[in-house]
Every structure is written in C-alpha cells, then in structure tokens.
A protein has these predicted regions:
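A glycine-rich beta-to-alpha transition motif near the start of alpha/beta enzyme domains, typified by
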Residues: 81-195, 246-360
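Peripheral docking tails and interdomain loops at the edges
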Residues: 7-81
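Conserved small/polar residues in nucleotide/adenosyl-binding loops
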Residues: 1-5
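Short acidic, glycine/serine/threonine-rich loops at helix termini
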Residues: 30-31, 57-61, 190, 212-214, ...
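Selected transmembrane alpha-helices and immediately adjacent juxtamembrane segments
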Residues: 236, 244-247
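Membrane helix-loop-helix hairpins that form the core translocation module of multi-pass transporters
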Residues: 194, 198-206
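Short glycine-rich anion-binding loops that position phosphate/pyrophosphate groups of nucleotides
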Residues: 21-26, 92, 146, 206, ...
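N-terminal, positively charged, Ser/Thr/Ala/Gly-biased leader segments
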Residues: 81-105, 201, 213, 218-239
Length: 360
C-alpha cells in the first residue's frame, strides 16, 4: 500500500524531493532503484543521505533556495575570502549594490545577492548590479533581485549604473550606453560639478503582446481586463518593460494591504515568470501615485520599470496624455516618465550613499 501511495504522490506533481532512509539490503535497494528511476523521469531530486536532506531542509527554511544556492567544489575551495569593492546607490529610494565585475570575480551572483542585500546581516538593498565587459556598449549590466533571481530590467538601476560609470571615468561624454536584457540602453546624463545628479534613459518599446509579457490570457493584448485574484475582481493592464508588469488603477493607493495582495498577484498562475504588480491612482493627467510590489523583492520605495508601466497603462487608457512628462509619485520619491509612440523614457535623480568592501 505504501509503495502505491509513494508512486501516486510522485505522479501527482506534489513532490519536489525524495529522501531514501531504507536499509541497504537487496530487496529494499531494488525498490529504491525503481522509485529513483520514476522520480528522475519526473525531474524530482533524490537524496540518499539524511545529512544532505537535513542541510537541504535548513536551506529551504532560510532565505536561500535551489535557485540561489551556490554549489562549491570541495576539492578546489578558496583558502581565503576575496574582497569586493562596491558602491551603495539609490534612485528615489530604490537602492542597489553596484559592483564592478569586469574581471569576472563574482562567480555566483545569486548567492552573493541574497547575503549582501539582507538589511540586517548584509549591506542591504533591493538588489545588486554587476558591471561587466560589453562588446556593443560602454558596459554590460546584470541585475539580480533581493531573492537572488535575475531581474531582467530595472530602470532605476540603469540610471545608477550610468552614474557609476561616469563618476569613475569608466565612460566619457554626456551619454552612456549600457547593455542590459539583450538590448543596448542609452542614458543621457545631467551633471553638477562634474558628477551625475540625474539621468534619463530610453527604456525602449512598451510590449503588450501577452506571449511576450508573459501572461497566460487570450487576446492580442490585456488592457483593462477584468480578472480574479485572491477571490477579488481587478481590472488589469499587462505589459512588459523588459520584465513583466501588471498595472491596476485603484481609488486609494495607501489603503491597500500590499503585503497580502502583492504576493497573490506576483505568484498568480496566469504569470508564468511571476509579475511586478503596480497599484496606481491618476491624481491628474500629469501625475500618478503608485505603489509597486516587485517579484523577488516585495514592496519597494520606487521602481523605474513600474513607473514606466503605470504611465504607459494610463496613456493607453486615455487617463494621461502621450508625449508629455508624467510625474510618478512613489513612496521613496518622484520619477518622470514620458510615453511617445509606445516608447518609454524615464528620468530620475541618482545618488551614492556610501562605498565599502565585501568579504566574498
């Protein structure tokens, strides 16, 4: 009976790991081999050591998971930690740890990100940005969310990386090009006493095609569509700014319990890659109030792509004008967005909080 139940659980898709604790006898090993083969066919990890299983349980209980845990070669471990120089930077309160990784020193950004972004035991931040070599731009940016997952695109982070490059003479002129998300972004710099104090980036095309957002809903686009999330009805507009966004216009932004509603949106089944959920109110035709619950981060003080998404949705629905600056007010400050022919332009102030060295 127990053998049948084990196979039924494996077939149900509810099992992520199999831990074998049976005796090493011929009859039990044959049963394990058969179970092991079936589990592997369903892409289920099989563990044969209680120590390994306990270590995995500790990992799953912590903020680490199978996507951001570093595999270490025990035969070739480093004898000492190396030093990573970083800059802690912010744009309207969304803060990133910016690291020059042109030498390829960071081997597992996902694991580094989880520890470094912890606001109690690390530097603290909404994510990390690695600056790397590029053949097609001044530099390449790879951004990771606080949980170690790849961020894809981040508008505020682009502005901060541009400031980092200019202020350290890693790029010259009044414009910086950054390779990010498979595209090259152009960032115009505004200087005070030779340092970048604000910047403007062409965020590129606003994408509404569901397959490219992605969102698993029918139709050529999802605009002002009524859907059910957490047993409540919401009118949503889904789009991509290089990462997936879902925008909902509400009467009272401050009244929302984002710690409850946010995860329901982020992990809804219609979003195969999760989603950044924006909750907006149009104050007037040139001002939007916005809160964003980011995938992998939770609610943040600001979100550049989220501001672009909210402005684009407002223009799409005729709530705000095209080709005009729209002030997007977020908990951490203001961002300026302009939508022109389904392209988004983001402007924001940039600042460095401090520099330091991480033991890595």
């Amino acid at each position: 009976m127990y053998k049948r139940q084990a196979y039924e659980l494996i077939e149900s898709g509810k099992v992520s790991y199999v831990v074998y604790t049976g005796a090493l006898r011929d009859d039990t090993m044959l049963e394990y081999i058969a179970l092991h083969r079936r589990a592997l066919a369903k892409s289920i990890a099989c563990l044969t050591s209680l120590d390994t299983a306990n270590a995995l349980a500790d990992i799953l209980k912590s903020r680490y998971n199978e996507r951001n845990t570093e595999l270490v070669d025990l035969c070739h471990m480093r004898e000492a930690r190396s030093e990573l120089h970083f800059a802690k930077m912010q744009c309207a309160g969304t803060d990133y740890i910016v690291i020059d990784n042109r030498n390829g020193q960071v081997s597992c950004a996902e694991s580094l990100c989880v520890g470094a972004c912890d606001r109690h035991f690390g530097v603290g931040g909404d994510g990390i940005a690695l600056i790397e070599q590029s053949d097609i731009a001044d530099a390449k940016m790879r951004m990771f969310n606080r949980d170690g997952s790849p961020g894809g695109m981040a508008g505020g982070c682009l502005l901060l990386v541009a400031k980092y490059l200019h202020d350290r003479a890693l790029a010259a002129g009044g414009e910086v090009t950054i390779e990010a998300g498979g595209d090259v972004k152009r960032v115009k710099l505004f200087l005070t006493d030779g340092k970048v104090t604000s910047a403007r980036v062409d965020m590129g095309e606003v994408v509404y095609e569901p397959a490219r957002v992605p969102v698993a809903l029918p139709g050529s686009e999802v605009v002002d569509r009524l859907i059910e999330i957490g047993r409540r009805d919401f009118r949503v507009t889904c789009l991509s700014m290089g990462n997936p966004h879902c925008v909902t216009f509400v009467e009272r932004v401050d009244a929302l319990d984002l710690q409850v509603i946010g995860p329901l949106f982020e992990n809804a089944g219609i979003f195969p890659e999760r989603v950044n959920a924006g909750f907006a109110r149009v104050v007037n035709e040139r001002m939007i109030k916005l809160r964003v619950y980011e995938r992998g981060n939770g609610e943040t003080l600001a979100c550049g792509t989220g501001a672009c998404a909210a402005a684009a949705a407002a223009v799409k629905l005729g709530k705000c004008p095209e080709g005009e600056d729209i002030t997007v007010k977020l908990p951490g400050g203001d961002l300026i967005v302009r939508i022109e022919r389904d392209r988004a332009y983001l402007t924001g102030e940039t600042a460095q909080a401090f520099e330091g060295v991480l033991a890595y």
